[in-house]
Curated annotation (Swiss-Prot):
Record protein name field: ATP-dependent Clp protease proteolytic subunit
Gene3D superfamilies on file: 2-enoyl-CoA Hydratase, Chain A, domain 1
Family: Belongs to the peptidase S14 family.
Species annotation: Gossypium barbadense (Sea Island cotton)
GO MF term (any one): ATP-dependent peptidase activity
Pfam families: CLP_protease
Major location (coarse): plastid
Gene Ontology biological process terms from the UniProt entry: protein quality control for misfolded or incompletely synthesized proteins
Summary of the function given for this chain in its UniProt record: Cleaves peptides in various proteins in a process that requires ATP hydrolysis. Has a chymotrypsin-like activity. Plays a major role in the degradation of misfolded proteins.
Reactions that this protein is recorded to catalyse: Hydrolysis of proteins to small peptides in the presence of ATP and magnesium. alpha-casein is the usual test substrate. In the absence of ATP, only oligopeptides shorter than five residues are hydrolyzed (such as succinyl-Leu-Tyr-|-NHMec, and Leu-Tyr-Leu-|-Tyr-Trp, in which cleavage of the -Tyr-|-Leu- and -Tyr-|-Trp bonds also occurs)
Known EC number: 3.4.21.92
Active-site residues, Swiss-Prot/TrEMBL: S101, H126
UniProt signal peptide: none
Localization of this protein: Plastid, Chloroplast stroma
Amino acid sequence: MPIGVPKVPFRNPGEEDAVWVDVYNRLYRERLLFLGQEVDSEISNQLIGLMVYLSIENDTKDLYLFINSPGGWVIPGVAIYDTMQFVQPDVHTICMGLAASMGSFLLAGGEITKRLAFPHARVMIHQPASSFYEAQTGEFILEAEELLKLRESLTRVYVQRTGKPLWVVSEDMERNVFMSATEAQAHGIVDLVAVK
């Protein structure tokens, strides 16, 4: 039997009595955001809304995005990335578990010097994929062109965020490249590996 999302007490400033809120709402109030699933439009819109709201609420207090994601859709992921760059507060990114595909892209998108991986975290980068097998011939060609543009765009961001040469990033994106936390640090995707 599922227990649902745990509730925790929270006292609003100026109020005597605490109210019970789900743990995620409590953490959001502390500016702690979570991506713990595949990136899709729904989670993308939720995270974007939270980042914008929290930025408006206080534009000097940093945000923390915890990532444990197998990746997901490119466009919703890029929307999260763009929002991270747009909001005034610095966005720390923390990899716990796995940051693969779009998850690693978002991990690299944190404020430089504020990107962290837990010691046993795994990171994976690769090129964007498509559903070519579902497309008609004309659609296939248009989709291939769009996919190449997306790949170039993602590659440029990785080059900028990691400091690696274009040829290294391009070569790495040709296949699934898995990394430990320390390898991700050496690759420039994270700046720090958490220690006990």
